[in-house]
Amino acid sequence: FRPHLYPLIGPHGDSVTRRLAKPEDDLDHPHHRSVWVSHGEVNSFNNWGEGEGSGRTVHKEFQAVESGPAYGRILAIGAWVGSEGWKSPVRSNELLEERAEWTFYNTPNNGRIIDLHLTLTCQEMDVLFGDTKEGGLCSVRVEESMQVSSGQGGRITNASGGRNEDETWGKRAAWCDYSGPVNGNDVGVALMDHPASFRHPTFWHVRNYGLMTANPFGLSHFYNNTNRRGWLVLSPGQTLVGMYRIFVHDQGPDEADVANKYNDFAYPPQVSLAE
């Protein structure tokens, strides 16, 4: 139904994201596929779930695939479309063009850094991003042993010091971290929201069962107030931008210095040349 990034390998060689669901698996929320981009209400189409009637993101091409000593880069172009068989009232069946630029940095083994620069461009008809908690511009589903609900030591932490779902769900924060054990090693993954992203600092749809997603749309749910509206309408040619960093680290967020790693992302050193 949509592209995803899997596996997300941590510092000890194991994936920090859950295995991909197969039809015969009894996994909850099988549409939570490692690291992905989607939203639950796009012109009435559900491009978050899977199944009959769901919207889709169709991969079109890789405009760039690069590798080098400092970083590798992939620029993937996709199209957000309606459910299978849907016919648009305009020329194309595309609601949005997705440009997902992924940069994979060559970093020390105790920490891995991946940047996502996401641009969604409205095509030939107005597009409504609905106010729903089911979705987000960048989502992560962690390995099962890392889940808070597993009782094995998993924990959620946000930039404001909130802990676990009760203190982080629906809250705004510049970053959110999910840490816990994988094959005997304490590891974590932090998702960071850049100041240039839409509605920074983002709201978080983060759950004790392993989901962590940056969702800037679901305001009525997060505030529990139907007068707070988070929907957005794009007209043809308008764009929505999200910039995120995924920091996969050893140990917990304090030991990995996630707060300062966020500052490196949001406020990098500036270089100027004197004449």
List each language-model region with its residue ranges.
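Short, well-ordered beta-strand segments enriched in hydrophobic/aromatic residues
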Residues: 114-122
